[in-house]
Amino acid sequence: MFDFLPSSLQVTLPILFKIVAIVLPLILIVAWLTFAERKIIGYMQGRIGPNRVGPRGWLQPIADTVKLLLKEIIIPASANRILFLLAPVLAIAPALAVWAVIPFDAHLVLADINAALLYILAIGSMSVYGIILAGWASNSKYAFLGAMRSAAQVVSYEIAMGFALVGVLIAGGSLNLGEIVQAQEGGFWHWFWLPLFPLFLIYFISGVAETNRLPFDVAEGESEIVAGFHVEYSGMAFALFFLAEYIEMILVSTLAALMFLGGWLSPFQGTVLEAIFEWVPGIVWLLIKTAIFLFFYLWFRATFPRYRYDQIMRLGWKVFIPITIVWLLVVGGARVAQLGPWFT
């Protein structure tokens, strides 16, 4: 296809096309996820939600994007200008980089590396640097306090999340995401959610805490510290933080589907319904499972009040981490005993 180009471009262009094919849909999904969030929470609270721009409000995300693009990026006089502008980039770059190893189907992945799970844990943890930098560079006590809260929270829940994913690693016998999904073949009852149920719950709740979403959004608690680490941000600089948060939400949901719910595998494998749904592409099953987890994100926001900071820390260190360690021992024993059908 690119034979007429220099050899260096023949390698680079296909990779760039694949990156665009992942990043562009992600940005579009984020745009309409914000619309879905406002509508769903509106219905839960007996309201209509946005309904003015376009038919039934479906063009509201476009209006929001135009508004953010036209707004001025105001830099406080006492802020560190370079670091202030660098922080949003440092927040969104890791959130996008992680998607390089996410498989959407058996052979639909940008980089099929064997240490994909390790890569996700390493790169995913780097987004906290953007948050810390934003809090420090803003030269605001509210921003700095929000950044410190966020850093402590992310580090705390990353341990529990990492231990939960180690359980999947033991069960699947691989760090490759595709191989972990293939290890769950056999239908709904063969997926890892059943033997790893406590780790499944802890992973998802830790994911909600890591993305600073309600009820764990003390890092940007409006009633306590105005708006947290991005209190001084406006325009597209603010939009990048916003984009990073929602991309991480989608990432946590997609990983939950891959690690615990069989990824792109049909839930009807091994049943009489398997032949009926055989025509459904694997990526559709993955999108449905991801959408279910995203709905839980929105449901939590509409349902639960914000936890106190000390309650969040206690939950992470004194409840989640001990449970994950105990269950890892249980999973290790089940693996040694080759308990079927998950650990054979």
UniProtKB/Swiss-Prot annotation:
Protein name (record): NADH-quinone oxidoreductase subunit H 2
Keyword Electron transport: no
Any one GO molecular function term: oxidoreductase activity, acting on NAD(P)H, quinone or similar compound as acceptor
Any one of the GO CC terms: plasma membrane
Disulfide pattern: none
EC class (word): translocase
Keyword Cell inner membrane listed: yes
Catalytic activity reported: a quinone + NADH + 5 H(+)(in) = a quinol + NAD(+) + 4 H(+)(out)
UniProt-listed HAMAP family: NDH1_NuoH
NCBIfam families: PRK06076.1-2
Phylogenetic classification of the source organism: Bacteria, Pseudomonadati, Pseudomonadota, Gammaproteobacteria, Chromatiales
Residues in the signal sequence: none
Superkingdom of this protein's organism: Bacteria
Function per UniProt: NDH-1 shuttles electrons from NADH, via FMN and iron-sulfur (Fe-S) centers, to quinones in the respiratory chain. The immediate electron acceptor for the enzyme in this species is believed to be ubiquinone. Couples the redox reaction to proton translocation (for every two electrons transferred, four hydrogen ions are translocated across the cytoplasmic membrane), and thus conserves the redox energy in a proton gradient. This subunit may bind ubiquinone.
Membrane topology of the entry: Multi-pass membrane protein
Organism this protein belongs to: Nitrosococcus oceani (strain ATCC 19707 / BCRC 17464 / JCM 30415 / NCIMB 11848 / C-107)
Family: Belongs to the complex I subunit 1 family.
EC number(s) reported in the record: 7.1.1.-
Subunit text: NDH-1 is composed of 14 different subunits. Subunits NuoA, H, J, K, L, M, N constitute the membrane sector of the complex.
Subcellular location: Cell inner membrane
Keyword annotations of the record: Cell inner membrane, Cell membrane, Membrane, NAD, Quinone, Translocase, Transmembrane, Transmembrane helix, Ubiquinone
InterPro entries xref list: NADH_UbQ_OxRdtase_su1/FPO, NADH_UbQ_OxRdtase_su1_CS
Transmembrane segments: 13-33, 82-102, 116-136, 161-181, 188-208, 240-260, 280-300, 319-339
